[in-house]
Design a protein with these regions (language model features):
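Short, structured segments at the rim of ligand-binding sites
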Residues: 2-430
Length: 430
């Protein structure tokens, strides 16, 4: 049933009735991390035994990777937020363009398929329309482990008789590359040392699952990770960490609307950077306990500059929602995007709502405060969609967003959660 509900067209529309003095108030439960569950699902390819995951968010990307996993030979059962998945044998080594195009994270099956099956054929990714995300770092690493990799007709074809441990230094930080190579090295011969690894909590979460499966990994959460390959991995149960990007989005919603929101089921130390920035802009944020925070927005939002960078820096996934917040701040902010090129698709749409923003290369110069008014706008990717929903909340009158289905890729019950806090958002039937 979940699959049917979530097989949504990304061109769906949502209507928001906003107002300048909207205050969001209440409690919201944060879901499991999308960017953690995708690699952990891919990791089930490394064993014949069953992997059980809890706190799984029911978002479209999860259903996309599960469809891909079924094609590769997986059987799964999904019950609310609990997923049981098993790949007794690999039925196909090909991840087709149709599915990889729908979600770039499908590249995460490349390493596990190769490590267990000796060959993998994975389409070059499509996914979000936000600039280039090179797969070269993944390919280079697999070659160093002894795989022969060719690019043919839009597919990455990798083969290896055996994979031998080695030292691999990533040219630049890569979350997917780190994840792919940690998984592959877990079933390689001997010792692999990965240098300049990504520090994201989602990478650590994957490593924690691999440990439970029997992998030998040292340096989890550090820039240098050491893996001693084992002959085989087994089944395991694992709780997915909370989604720090969803949590950050709701913190911004509270700050933006002079709201009073309590977030539960979180890991507060996973988004310290956002908390610091929001406090600087005037929000009051209190830690209630290890798993909950309260945000109280202030009447005056203070402008500030941000520069995106890899964890523990300011996350690129929160750049668009933060830009919306800065349209309501007094003064000028400079938002610099260093991770992805072309990640300013939300800006033209914010202009339609009345924002004052100028793009100069990798910078967006936001002049506030702008009184926003509702209009018809379009979202081209997941985080842009979230930013535009937030803008619609504080724009007077009706805002209709096309491309709202992008939200379903990464936010579980986004409108429902916002409506429970006092928003007025409705999905429109095409």
């Amino acid at each position: 049933l979940g699959y049917i509900i979530l097989k949504l067209n990304s061109m769906e529309k949502i209507r928001i009735l906003g107002r300048h003095n909207l205050q969001l108030k209440g409690k919201v439960k944060i879901s499991g991390a999308k960017n953690s569950v995708l690699p952990t699902i891919a990791a089930s390819l490394l064993t014949e035994e069953k992997i059980q995951l809890k706190n799984v968010p029911l978002v479209k990307d999860v259903f996309t990777i599960l469809t891909l996993m079924q094609e590769l030979g997986a059987e799964y059962e999904l019950d609310n937020d609990s997923l049981s998945i098993q790949v007794k044998r690999i039925r196909s080594e090909e991840a087709s363009y149709e599915l990889v195009r729908a979600m770039r994270a499908s590249i995460l099956v490349l390493g596990p398929l190769l490590a267990r099956h000796g060959k993998a054929v994975v389409s070059l990714p499509g996914g979000c329309a936000i600039g280039s995300r090179p797969t070269d770092l993944h390919i280079h690493g697999l070659e160093k482990l002894g795989a022969s990799v060719n690019l043919e007709h839009g597919y990455i074809k990798a083969e290896a008789k055996s994979l031998e441990g080695t030292i691999i230094e990533f040219e630049k930080k890569t979350v997917g590359g780190t994840e792919n190579l940690v998984m592959t090295a877990s079933l390689s011969h001997g010792e692999t040392i990965l240098k300049n690894c990504s520090l994201e909590p989602e990478v650590s979460d994957l490593c924690e699952l691999l440990l439970k499966m029997g992998a030998k990994i040292e340096g989890i959460g550090e820039e240098t990770i050491r893996i001693i390959g084992v002959k085989e991995l087994g089944g395991a149960s694992h709780n997915i960490i909370p989604d720090r990007i969803e949590a950050s989005t709701f913190l911004i919603a509270g700050a933006l609307t002079e709201g009073d929101i309590v977030l539960t089921h979180i890991k507060a130390d996973h988004f310290d950077t956002i908390v610091e920035k929001l406090k600087f802009s005037g929000a009051k944020i209190d830690k209630l306990d290890d798993n909950s925070l309260r945000v109280i927005g202030s009447q005056e939002i203070k402008a500030q500059d941000i520069t995106t960078s890899s964890y523990p820096g300011f996350p690129t996934d929160i750049q668009a929602p933060f830009t919306t917040l800065m349209t309501q701040a007094e003064g000028t902010s400079i938002i610099t995007e260093t991770i992805f090129d072309r990640r300013f698709s939300h800006v033209n749409e914010l202009l339609r709502l009345g924002a004052n923003i100028e793009i100069l290369g990798d910078k967006a110069i936001v002049k506030g405060k702008s009184l926003l008014s509702g209009a018809e706008i379009i979202a081209t990717d997941l985080r842009a969609a979230a930013a535009l929903v937030l803008a619609g909340l504080v724009a007077s009158g009706e805002t209709v967003i096309s491309g709202a289905g992008h939200l379903d890729r990464g936010y579980e019950k986004f409108e429902e959660k916002l409506n429970s806090l006092g928003a007025d958002i409705k999905r429109l039937e095409e």
